[in-house]
Amino acid sequence: MFIGVISDTHKYFNENVKNFLKDVDLVLHAGDFGNIETANKIADFKPLKGVYGNCDGTDIREYHPYIQVLDIEGIKILMMHIGGYPGRYDYRAMQLINAHRPDIFICGHSHILKVIYDNKFNCLTINPGAAGIEGFHVVRTAIRFHIDEGKIHDMEIGEWPKKVIKEE
C-alpha cells in the first residue's frame, strides 16, 4: 500500500501537495486541517484517516478522533497531533506509545519535518512538517512511502516553497 502523510494544512491544500499524493492509496493527516472544507477536499481527493489538531474545531473533531491506531499490511501505526520526537515526547504521546507499541508513530504540530527511529520504543517517528502556509516554517513538506508485507520502503519527501499568497 502506498501511504501519504501530511499535517498542518491550516485551510491550504494545493496542487503541489495533490501532485505529490496523486498515486497514494491512503492519506494520513496528523491534525490541524484548519476547517471542515479542507478535510472534505482531502477526503474527496483520496481515502483519508486523520486526527484533529489543537487548531481544529468541533466540526472536524466530530469526524477525526484524538488518536488513530491503524494496522496497514502488518504495520501498526499510532497517529496523534501533538507528539514530539524520541527523547522529547509529549507526556500523553509517551503513554500512548508505551501502551500501543506501534511500528510507526506519526504526529504533527511542530511544522518541522522529522523522521527519527526510536531505539527505546523500536518505532519510526514521523512528523511530515506542515503542508499549509500558516506558521513559522520556511518550506512546506509531505511524506510518502510504501508498506508491503510488514515492511516500510521507498520513503520520499516532498518540499515546496512557502507561499505568502493563497492559490485557488
Where are these regions (language model features)?
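Detector for methionine-enriched segments
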Residues: 1, 79-80, 94, 155
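Active-site environment of divalent metal-dependent phosphoester hydrolases
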Residues: 11-15, 33-38, 55-60, 84-89, ...
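Conserved beta-sheet core of the metallophosphoesterase superfamily
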Residues: 49, 88-151, 155
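Short, solvent-exposed aromatic-acidic interface loops
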Residues: 154-167
